[in-house]
């Protein structure tokens, strides 16, 4: 049996176990005129906080406008935690065949050559429907359903290494804002919901995935050049220190938890949009499933203007070309991608030395 068939069988089996049609208790909720069945609504999803699946659904409905701004209209893989945040999860790339007619799907082609029909959210009812499947956080691709080959978002993922103070993440985020601004782009920051910060940058959808990744790599290297003590663009963990700027999050088929995603942490932490004025003092632990709805109701969404701020990648791509003339060629890609012509040896330095 092929791995694709096995994955499909597993997904169908899980759908069967987790389907609202099972005799277990369910709750029917009305969302924008549509009926959504929530199976096992009292199932505990965050044991340390006593939060249930229904609490998770209600959270997403409370912040639906912001969550859909980040994830709506984009194909997305379903990261399903059928036993809650402390249980096992699996990525389901194929949209469930049993989905309602108002839940869209679009066919994607992956670097491996495989294809799959992935879910596209258009409204709050569809959002509630995928949360019922056990999706705690949302993982949309950086493209719109109408143009799957040209991303409209560059994603800056700041990932601190072990023991790195969060203040260094703040400093790198502010420097990233500076570099982006110098290259004609406006970044919108958010907590990652874990230990880092993400910066979303809307771009004109006219560059390919490799070009967007090249721009992200150029950005990462420039940040590292300006703050070498706390920032790194090095792919191999043994070469890293400080805050890693993960340029490969912009490679095709990579996804990042989107705005207002609840993360599978014990405290149900949320990847929360921020204003730049909040970044110097932000404390990620303050933003949880229990606290963010009130913040959203009071302050609105700091990312509300993002769709009006699409910029050009050309200046970052010009920077990339200058870096190449200085001897900085391509950097390693993730393991399952075909090796590029200019890519260095795809092996950690310590392994290369042994050969």
Stretches with model-predicted labels:
Residues 191-201:
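Short, conserved phosphate-binding/catalytic loop or strand-edge motifs used
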Residues 78-81, 187-193, 233-237:
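Short beta-strand
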Residues 10-17:
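Short hydrophobic targeting helices and cationic amphipathic motifs
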Residues 59, 166-185, 212-227:
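Long, well-ordered alpha-helical scaffolding segments within enzyme catalytic domains
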Residues 200-213:
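Catalytic palm subdomain of template-directed nucleic-acid polymerases
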Residues 23-32, 62-155, 159-162, 170, ...:
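SsDNA-processing nucleotidyl-transfer enzymes
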Residues 18-50, 57, 68, 72-73, ...:
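C-terminal accessory nucleic-acid interaction domains of nucleic acid-metabolism proteins
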């Amino acid at each position: 049996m092929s791995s694709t068939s096995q994955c499909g069988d597993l997904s169908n089996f899980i759908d069967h176990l987790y389907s609202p049609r099972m005799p277990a208790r369910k709750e029917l909720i009305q969302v924008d005129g549509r009926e959504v069945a929530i199976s096992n609504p009292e199932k505990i999803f965050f044991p340390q906080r006593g939060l249930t699946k229904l609490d998770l659904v209600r959270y997403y409905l409370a912040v639906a406008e912001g969550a859909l701004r980040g994830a709506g209209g984009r194909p997305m893989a379903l990261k399903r935690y059928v036993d809650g945040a402390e249980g096992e999860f699996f990525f389901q790339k194929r949209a469930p065949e049993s989905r309602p007619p108002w839940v869209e799907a679009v066919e994607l082609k992956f670097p491996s050559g495989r294809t799959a029909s992935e879910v596209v959210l258009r409204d709050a009812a569809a959002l509630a429907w995928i949360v019922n499947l056990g999706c705690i956080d949302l993982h949309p691709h950086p493209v719109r359903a109408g143009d799957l080959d040209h991303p409209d978002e560059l994603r800056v993922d700041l990932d601190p290494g072990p023991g790195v103070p969060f203040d260094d993440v703040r400093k790198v985020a502010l420097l990233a804002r500076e570099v982006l601004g110098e290259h004609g782009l406006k970044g919108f920051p958010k907590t990652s919901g874990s230990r880092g910060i993400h910066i979303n940058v809307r771009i004109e959808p006219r560059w390919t995935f490799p070009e967007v990744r090249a721009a992200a790599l150029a950005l990462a290297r420039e940040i590292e050049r300006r703050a070498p003590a706390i920032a790194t663009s090095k792919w191999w963990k043994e070469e890293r220190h400080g805050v890693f700027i993960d340029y490969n999050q912009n490679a095709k088929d990579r996804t990042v938890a989107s705005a207002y995603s609840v993360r599978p942490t014990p405290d149900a932490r949320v990847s929360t949009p921020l204003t730049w004025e909040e970044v110097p003092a932000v404390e990620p632990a303050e933003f949880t499933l229990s606290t963010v709805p009130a913040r959203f109701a009071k302050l609105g969404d700091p990312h509300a203007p993002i769709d009006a701020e699409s910029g050009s990648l050309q200046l970052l791509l010009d920077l990339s070309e200058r870096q190449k003339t200085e001897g900085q060629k391509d950097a390693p890609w993730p393991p399952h991608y075909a090796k590029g012509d200019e890519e260095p040896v795809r092996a950690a330095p310590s392994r290369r030395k042994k050969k």
